[in-house]
Amino acid sequence: MENNSQRIDKSISLPNRVGKYGATLFRPKEIVTKPDTSTSIVVEWKNTKKLSPQVPVKEDLNIIYKNSLITDGENKGQKLDLHMNIMYHPNSDKPTDIILFIPGGGFISCDINSSLLLVRQNLHKNNYAVAAIEYHVVGNGFYYDALEDIKDAINFLRNNEKKYNYDFSKLIILGNSAGGYFTALYTIKNPQGIKCAIDLYGLSDLTKVGIDYDEECYKNHLTKNSSESMYIFGCLSGKGVGDDENEAQKANPVNYVTGKEPPFLFMHGDSDRNVSNSQTLLVHNKILEKGGKSIRYVLKDDDHGRGGFDSEEMLNVILKFINDNVN
């Protein structure tokens, strides 16, 4: 496929999302760069059949998998319990594969109850255990705290495989948006024991979150008020990713790619107005450059998590990817 990276006009403007301490998810007035699809598969799933809600065979809610502390903000040092929801198959003849789901939320929230719920329910219906986890976000921690949370969640899953009837040796990581970012960063830095990883419209280089957008939006992402800046430096630091790029690059999964990662699947809408489409491309291309295995889908005319991201077509691609790399 040819490289189509010329400027385009996508002039639908959405309001910024503002969280605690003024942490802001800046949205563009327009998308000015057309996605490079030269190493990706372009699909149009917007008007295809949608997933239907599914009732889990069994689901345990609000399990405390970690007793932690708030490490940033005005409540620093106070107790913070982190929870997990897990859908599982207690009566399956043999243990199922296990999917660890890391929810998105712009680094300012992580909702384990609703984030990507249709996809999780339908993965569970296809005989997977699916565990969704909370983690530190802006206002109660830093990005590196979240990496520790993921490690602790994985340890919890390792220690409870018999209780929930899954095979921990068949661990899959799935995340969307901010959760996609952590799917990439954690898996690339800690590949041992992970069979494959699925990153849906996730961030990567936090100095380039707005690189595909109008200049005002791009520059706003570099300021102290952006959620990514507060996540790296702290909500009261007054520093932006544009002030200390060296420190920001420590949080960039691209910089840790070796080519020895588990297989990756990326999916990203070409009209995403929260996370520049090029963010997943950076990781995908680096993995390919290093000789690793990565597949990337670009969803035509789809915004952030919308359109084809709750389609049966998407689910089928995910199921095939898992089957090809786990079973």
Where are these regions (language model features)?
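Alpha/beta-hydrolase active-site loop
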Residues: F142-K162
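C-terminal catalytic histidine-bearing segment of alpha/beta-hydrolase fold enzymes
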Residues: M267, N274-N277, L281-N327
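Short amphipathic alpha-helix adjacent to the substrate-entry channel of hydrolases
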Residues: N113-A131
